[in-house]
Every structure is written in structure tokens, then in C-alpha cells.
């Protein structure tokens, strides 16, 4: 049977490192040859869902005035070789809402690319008539405060189960958005169907046609363009969400993307008791993965939420099996340790949040599977406890995936209808218990002191909490907690609130359990990262309060009703404006000053600033005070107007190029989003842009986002994508980058892109982790401490002495023979660098370099062997690459670098 972890994916996505495909018994030509036969069968297949027994064997009769999907779209979602895009889906939902009194559309905002985003609220007409009442009941039960058990029980008895269902986040997982159309039609049109009647009476369905409208349009357009060609099932060469692609499901608590913000805002408004998101694909050869998940789970999840999650999973499997739909599997491959999944973060707000993974071939192209293709241990079709009805192979079509998804959605709605009152009351119990737990035990609160190295990032952390529905207070006078006095203006998060588990999940350090395939075997691979402690990532000091907060201290706190960033200001008189390098916002200000026509430089001498003595402060002149005051307000910076300081090294606005391959690199998207937000205006560099050379004439700095050396060098191989999207930088691109650096340019490589720079630019640096087996060294993503080795170097300006970096599958570096440059940051020599998460044999890192500057000719290569901008969360390490961007402009002297082995500046204490 299945290992609890080992997955056998059915060609879900092709990366640049997976160019060699195994030949398939059923070819794309076979599929196209069957298209005519398939289309002839489409009409007969269209009524499958109604005939397989979803309503106890009776056909659900549609009212005449409710349009069928076919009547609006011209095709039935699920048909072979057909995908409806978002615009078409939206048009159908509009027709449905016009025709049915069970459907109401609401606008939840706009997408990144400016599409209007609407979702359907589906329930009985009498429920829709009093929708605000049911929303208020759900909100009261989700909060729990001000209710006793009797009052909560009465509300649960009166209320309706609000259930979130959606068409998925990941647009290449195409079945979800097609299923939404059919599910909406069924709920809007069914007559004489007891199951649907019970759902409409007891449940209010929040049906999101898709959680990624932009991506649905992009993927559908790509498929239609290639349909009938040899590239029919080729992967999309660009991100299907403008900036983050697949990581749109890693943004659950940060809410960086506008789509994430819309989902979180809407969920807080409606307070659904269940949040169910559809994904693809299932571990092969199973047809659908359903919770329970594999170990481990967070201890911050209320047990009732976990119990109901498992109940829903088992009910889905039973529902499908009862209707002749085999292949459901549990406890294989997917854990939910990381809380940042957009479809899971809500469980820390006591909403039963989960996902399923339904089998996928590619797009709407069918595929035949024989048992001979199954993994050897699956060919005997033996049933197991968590795989009770093995799938026996055969054709798998988009229609099949759509039907499994509709069945799963109906099972969830059926469960919600039958257990409406208990679900609502249990959610109240979870909120009640959370308040009680932190009323009577630590941590009683967390303090975010007003005195911070980067107050702007502390304020950003507060904003992130508030967007997640967390209540934050501010101290009107010095706040005493656990024997420590925090200054007035400090933020306080009292933990006796219903969503406190999310605060604890984000603020505490993670201790991932030791899980191995065998006592001496390799570690079991987590599904995602193991450590994410947000204050550590953002470089913000947060203090837990371990004694009860007194009534007097509470009285001095004021609830922050609406987030407002710290007030920026300009003080003093003078022709030069100076501000600290320590806040990340200083880079926003630099770029805004350039846009205003100012002259900008860095003060290479140590000077007195409000935050203390500092090297690398920023000085600006040639701009009006009004302009500086506006920029200070927008950047929340304290600026001093002074006489022109000594030692200013003038710079010009950096010209930044960002490499963007045709492999849909998520790290590139995150990098682009951050650079744009900070005003750098990066220029996209495709393969041919770099191969054309003359880069130094156009750019000061070029960034290579995280990717394998092979992916950067080779890209997709021939035959996988149309020719214009194949290949990587190749030898011509490597030569152009070498020329760029030799001519004085700065090349900045993130994480594994460092290995590309080492290999293809011939850098005398080695990866000390190369060749190690997982049992010899393992880190799936955790937070590690590094020590800054040379605080006087401009690449280190503004950084604390001991920043915390996100290490995720990258190298650890060591200078080799002939090295000329500097080690900028190293892992501590005499202790484990682990701060949060799981690290096996961390001694392999001790004393090794995490960030290196290598000199080549008149330029530099920066090797950042970690994720300095990981998912838009690791704000505390942004300066590693933002500082490096300006290195081509003479901030440090390349003619006198420290040789390898020189004694570094020892860190004495945290800065």
C-alpha cells in the first residue's frame, strides 16, 4: 500500500529540470483522433451527474427559466477539449442570477489584472431575503464573546451554515472552475430533489467560480491556442497569477496579493463555518485525495476543527463510493503544517478549512491509463484502510474530474445541512475555549514595542494581524509586562480573543517533530516549509507577556480601529535631508526622491542619527522641503534637514534588470512584485535580452531569482513548448553576464541561482552541501541565524548584526582557491544556526558562508545562498539585495577587497 508520504504524481507540471518525459502508451495523436467520437458522446454524458444517483437515483428537474450551461456557453463544462474561461463563466453566472431567485451575485473586488470579481450566494429565497441576519449570527458565533452556551445554542438553532466552496486557486488545475458552473446550475435549478432542498434550506453557499480569475483566462487562452497541435498539453510558460503563480496558495496570512486580500476580507465578513477549496492532482493512481492529512498538525488548531475536518473528509469518500466513484485516498502526501495556505489559514480562525486533490491529466485532453502503468505496489489493486476502493484504470477525462469535484462539494453541503446546528455551536465553542485558554494561561499577550530597529516593519506586522481579523491595541503610556517596561505607543495583542491561535501560530518558534521513514532512514519530507516565525522573518522584536495583564494596564490600552502607518516627518533646517538606512522604507524614499529630481547619496562616515550612530545614512538635496515632507509621510520616515554631511557618495537611480525565464518562475514573480513596490522599476530580461549582450550600457544590476543552474542554463527542452519558449541562457547568455560583470556591473543571484553563477561564470566558490544525502543534511525550509562579517561594507549597511534568513533547499558556500572578494554573512561557528523549524545535521552549515561578494574585473557577483525575499515575508533580509543593487556605483572599493581567510569583524551582540 501507499507510504504515508511517498507521492507518485501523474505529470502534474513540468519543470525545466524535467525535460525528459517517459513515452506514454496513449499519445496526443490518439486523443485527437478520438475527438470526433468523444464529441458525439458529449450530449449523452452531459446528464451523468443527475443520473448516477446524486439525488437517490432520481433526475433533478430544472425549471424552464433557468439556463443550462450549454445554452449560454455552447458547450458543457467537462467536455473533452473544452474549457470555459472566467469571462464566459461570469456571463453564465449573471444569466443564472437573473433567472433564479436562489442565486445572488456579489462583487468582492478587482483582480491584479483589473477584472471584476463576483461570487454567487446560493440558498433558498427566504434565506436570501434575510441574509444579513444569518451573516450576523455567523459572526456572533465565530466571535463567541458576549454569549453564554444557552444563547449560543439558540443562535446555532436559528442560523444557517455558511459554506465556502470554490473553483480552485491554481489555474492549471482546470476542473475546479468548470465544476463551479455545473454545481451552481444544479443548486439553482433542481426541483423535487430532497438533497438539494435540504441544502437550500439549511445552508448558504458562498460559491466562488474561481479564486484566480486572471489565471483562468490565461490558461484557457493558452490551451485554446495550442489545441490540436503537438503542444496541446504543454505547460504555460508564464505565471498564471501575475506575480506569484502557484504561490497564490502560500499567501494566506500575509495577504500580499489583492486576490488573497479579497478572500480574507470576504471570509471575515461572512464567517463561513466551512471553507473548502478544490485542487488537482491526486497521488497516482488514486482519483482524489481527501483529508485526514498526514502528520504533523499544529497544536494551535482547536480539536473540534480538526475532528470536523476529518468527518468531512470521510463523508466525501463515502458519498463518492456510494455513487460508484472509486479511488479516494486519505493520509498520503499532504500535511498542513504550514499555516500560510490560503485554503487553510482560516482554520486558525475556527473555520473548518481544507482542500482535496482530484486526479488531473492536462487541461481538457483525455488520457487512458492501464494498470501496467501503475506503480508496482499498486497493480494488485489491493484495498486498504485509507484506500478502500482502488481505481482500476481506464479513461480519465476532464468530465470525470468535474464529476468527482461536484460529488465532493455536494457531500460537504449535505453534511453541513444535516449537522448545521452542531457545526455552528462547535464553532462558538472553539471561540469560547480560545478566549478562556488565554485568559487563564500564557501567553496572555504579545507586545510589539514602539522602540524598534525598523518601526515601519513593526507597523506592517500590526497591519498584517489586523487584516487577518486580529484585534490590536496601543498603549497610551508606558506598558509594563513580565517585568519589562515598553514605551508609550507600543502595540499590544491581547490573547483573550477568538482568533488568538493564529497569533500564536505566527509568533512562536516552530519545533517540527522528527519524522523518518525508518529509524535510520532519511527524514520524511514535509509538504512545505517547517519554520516561518513572522517576527523573526520581518526583523521585528516581539515580547510575549507571561503574567496576566492587570486591569490598570488594560485601561491604558486603546483598540486600534483602523490601521495607520507611523507618521513621517521632517525636522531641522538645512539644505540636505538625511534619514536612516535601517528602515526598509528608506529604499522607497530613495526611489521617490530620484523620481522628484533629487540628488541622492549614502553617507560613508558614521554619523549621529535618532536611532543611534550609523554608517550608510541616506542624504538628499536639490529638492523642495514640501516634496521631502510628502515622501517622509508616505514612507513613515524621520528625516533631518541639516548642513551637507561629510563623506557623501553620490549615486544615480539604479537601472535594474530581472531575469525572467520561460519556466514560469515563482521566485521571479515575487522579486518583481517587491522591486515594483519599492519603486525600482525592474526591466524584464528574457533569454534573448541577455544573450544580445551590451548589458552594462543598459543596467547597473541584474538579478537572477532562485532557480536551479540547469533551469537557468537550459530552460525547457525542444518539443515541450513552442520553439520561442524553449532553451535557457546557454553559453551565449553566460558570456554576456560575464562581460557585464567585468565591465563593472553587479550580478545578484538568489539561493540556487548562486550555483548557476558559480558554474557558468567560473567563480572560485564551492557548495559544501553538494552530494550530501537527506540523512546527512536536510532542511526543507527553516529560519536560520547568520552573522554579518563586515558591518563597514556598504552591502551590510542597515542590517542587524545577526539577521535571520529563510533557508530553503539552497547551498552553503565556501571561498576556494583564487577567491577575491568578501564573505558578507556566515552561519555561526560554534552553535546551531536554527531559529525556527527543522534542521538535520546543521553542523554542516556552521562557519560556512550564507552571503558572498565575489569580485570579477570591475564588477561584482553577489551570491545570496538563501531566499532573501521569500514569499514577500522575509522583510528582514530585503536589504541584502537592495544594498547590492547600488554596489556598481562605487559605494565600496573593489580594488581592496578582503582576501579569503581574513579575520572578519566578530558580532558582539544583536544590533
Residue ranges: model-predicted function:
Residues 61-204, 244, 250, 256, ...:
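Intrinsic-disorder/low-complexity accessory segments
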Residues 200-257:
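Mobile, glycine- and charge-enriched loop segments
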Residues 54-60:
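Sec/Tat signal peptide C-region and signal peptidase I cleavage site
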Residues 35-45:
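Sec-dependent signal peptide recognition
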Residues 4, 10-24, 30-33:
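Short, low-complexity, charge-dense intrinsically disordered segments
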